[in-house]
Amino acid sequence: MATNEALAEYLALHHKGEANAVTSRELECSFQMRGSELRREINALRGDGIPICSFEGGYCYAATAEELERTIRQLRSRIKKIAFAERGLSSALPDYVDTGQLSLPLDGGDAP
């Protein structure tokens, strides 16, 4: 059984609903993976339609539509914040584009 399948089954059987959420640290220890690997696995499962929710208390398999909707709202909020940061960085990019021209200070110019 692949790690993500085992993870989905484990959450569905033992951690259904927010009241039964499991911490990231517990999952990392149980499945012997780093936090970044766990997040990647959770994201892949969600992408496959597996209803895994996250709360302050950790991760759980959704027990209700409300739990799932809350996680969806949380993800959408993060998407908006990431998109805002991306737009800001993209607007700064022209300042870093190499025009291929060499710039030399001139005598009496604005060189220190």
What positions do the PLM features span?
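Short amphipathic alpha-helical interaction segments
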Residues: 32-44
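Exposed, interaction-prone assembly regions rather than primary DNA-binding/catalytic cores
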Residues: 89-112
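A short acidic, leucine-rich amphipathic alpha-helix
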Residues: 23-30
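Short, amphipathic alpha-helical interaction segments positioned at domain boundaries
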Residues: 67-90
